[in-house]
Swiss-Prot record:
A lipid is attached at C24 (S-diacylglycerol cysteine). Its main location: membrane. NCBIfam families: MetQ/NlpA family lipoprotein (TIGR00363), PRK09861.1 (NF007364), PRK11063.1 (NF008285). It comes from Escherichia coli O157:H7. SUPFAM superfamilies: Periplasmic binding protein-like II. It is a lipid-anchor. InterPro entries: Lipoprotein_NlpA. GO terms for cellular component: plasma membrane. This is Lipoprotein 28. Belongs to the NlpA lipoprotein family. Residues 1-23 form the signal peptide. The gene is nlpA.
Length: 272
């Protein structure tokens, strides 16, 4: 049976229920405590710096809840298991709100993490051969983002009027007959070692685990004026809460900007 995103969300939610709900069924009502969802790895390392700033400047206790991928943080925030999350850009949030009926809002910008094309087989766009396989993210917003990046490099042409959410069906010209392989974002770094994959388009969030630098090691990369700035997200009913405001101010601090520059090898651009 084919597993849909709905099935994956439901199954993963059961596995993580003990983590999210142990000891407390809802997010904190204490204005000096906040529970924030983050993606494991480099983004959590950045959030740890914001956590320290929040404690030192505001006396705010930040509890970070780590996730291995992007399927669950919005579920947990919408359900009240988290106060906020920090892992996504605005188009991803808008798509998730529309698909799942969430009442989530952006409360402030964090960083632009440029998406880029990586390869262990080639060094330049000119070396991409006829019929090459290009792996891209499979969630709607990052899939569209990857296709727009391929179009920017003149590798494909997309149907006009599709905005930020084109799909592979909107490719109108593919002069090198590229084979597009759609995978979950967290899987993409691993396919760099797959002999069948020539290029993988990967977000900074996931490329960090490989030790590669978006600026120095990519074959091609997004412009820094990308519309895909990441955001801190909360619910409609707590977007103005003092703990949310203080965490945002802590995240948008010089200390966090400096840490992110180091952690992401120059691949994190402050968006505030």
């Amino acid at each position: 049976m084919k597993l849909t995103t709905h099935h994956l969300r439901a199954g993963a939610a059961l596995l993580l229920a003990g983590v999210l709900l142990a000891g407390c069924d809802q997010s904190s009502s204490d204005e000096k405590h906040i529970k924030v969802g983050v993606i494991n790895g480099a983004e959590q390392d950045v959030a740890e710096v914001a956590k320290k700033v929040a404690k030192e400047k505001y006396g705010l206790d930040v509890e970070l809840v780590g996730f291995s991928g992007s399927l669950l943080p919005n579920d947990a925030t919408n359900n009240g298991e988290l106060d906020a999350n920090v892992f996504q850009h605005r188009p991803f949030l808008e798509q998730d709100n529309q698909t799942h009926g969430y009442k989530l809002v952006a409360v402030g910008n964090t960083f632009v993490f440029p998406m880029a094309g990586y390869s262990k087989k080639i060094k330049t766009v000119a070396q991409i051969k006829e019929g090459a396989t290009v792996a891209i993210p499979n969630d709607p917003t990052n899939l569209g983002r990857a296709l727009l990046l391929l179009q920017k490099e003149k590798l494909i042409t997309l149907k006009e009027g599709k905005g930020l959410l084109p799909t592979a069906l909107d490719i109108t010209d593919n002069p090198r007959h590229l084979q597009i392989m759609e995978l979950e974002g967290a899987q993409l770094p691993r396919v760099l070692d797959d002999p069948k994959v020539d290029v993988a388009i990967i977000s900074t969030t996931y490329i960090e685990q490989t030790g590669l630098s978006p600026v120095n090691d990519s074959v091609f990369i997004e412009d820094k004026n990308s519309p895909y700035v990441n955001i801190l997200v909360a619910r409609e009913d707590n977007k103005n809460a003092e703990n949310v405001k203080e965490f945002l101010q802590s995240y948008q601090s010089p200390e966090v900007a400096k840490a992110a520059e180091t952690i992401f090898n120059g691949g994190a651009v402050p968006g505030w």
